[in-house]
């Protein structure tokens, strides 16, 4: 797993202040439709000083990564994904539930996540935050799931678990939502059905159900 660290030490702050900062950052990015919001703007909206943000999160990468992780605590989607992928075994039905949970969560995080993806080409802080969720969390979860399915004999013949996980990840990535739902006008329900169908046919045995 790739880990991004800050060289400077951070200072603990109250949970209330931390939440106010992270939710202010998310709200401002939604309003501005860009991820490069200044710390002064975030501080003003959260009712804190810039120094508080700097001391609590270290740098912009630390702030953005904490922000996207905080969003994951707003619903039980991530907890449910983790529970399924950390089980001792998995069936095709477990995998379907896993995909359903992610496809339900994707529209919630999309508005800011896609801004981070666009900025990631030239913005190391945005790249760090995006990788933390899309690779270190989502892709890693798919690798655990496909590993469990492989142990149960459910993968298509000749398909290795990690390669299968990367294929699934690409099919349900937020970039696909941008291309098909935003770009081509697909309805969310159409997107969900197509992703489930394509993933099923791509990685599972014909008798998987």
Predicted regions, residues:
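N-terminal intrinsically disordered/low-complexity leader segments
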Residues: 1-16
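Hydrophobic/aromatic-rich alpha-helical bundle segments in the mid-to-C-terminal region
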Residues: 5, 150-198, 209
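Generic hydrophobic, amphipathic alpha-helix propensity
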Residues: 14-26, 42, 52, 67-71, ...
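Helix-turn-helix
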Residues: 20, 28-62, 66
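Amphipathic alpha-helical linker/stalk segments
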Residues: 31, 65-98
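Short helix-capping/turn signature of helix-turn-helix
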Residues: 57, 118-123
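Amphipathic alpha-helical packing segments from all-alpha helical-bundle domains
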Residues: 100-116, 125-152, 162-166, 197-204
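Secondary-structure edge/capping motif, primarily at the C-terminal ends of alpha-helices
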Residues: 113-120, 183
